[in-house]
Amino acid sequence: MDFIGRTSELATLNTELERGSGFVVIYGRRRVGKTTLIKEFIKDKQAFYFLATTESEAQSMKRFAGVLSRTTKNPMLCKVTFTDWLDLFQVVADDHPDEKKVLVIDEFPYLVKTNPDFPSILQNAWDEVLKDHNVMLILCGSLISMMKKHALAYDSPLYGRRTAQMCMLRRTCRLSRLWSSMPLQAAYRNIWSFSRRMNRW
């Protein structure tokens, strides 16, 4: 079954992946489907998915190393104590360097709250490590003002790096139009499937 209601967004992400080194910013209110969209996009790709929280920076680095360990199937990475984000991003760049891969940082603003210098750190990582190694970077967040300030604004260190951005809105109206154009039985099936997904969100 098609991924209901976000086919255009999926198409945009796939186009960015073809660039080899896309930098995508996705933002919008909570529970509009940002993470669901991203996970649908990366499910059949070489991807590193990291969900930031309000924990300390050291703990974030430790969990990020765990993501790298599981994705690269290198258990030794879990035993390393990383103190520099650049070293972690280098692991992403070095993994299958000739293949396209995706790095997702979900709830990006939490990392900025923990370390206000993180946008500068990420800018350096993108320019010096990630950009030329077939990495597509996705920054996602629900704190809209912080996403605009730290990922999109002119005075952000990340300004000028993005290749695409998405402001995701609720899709009720779009889905209503979609379902109204379907045969009745197909519409019922899709509404039932959509309801189950909403419950999981």
PLM feature spans:
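Phosphate-binding site recognition
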Residues: 1-201
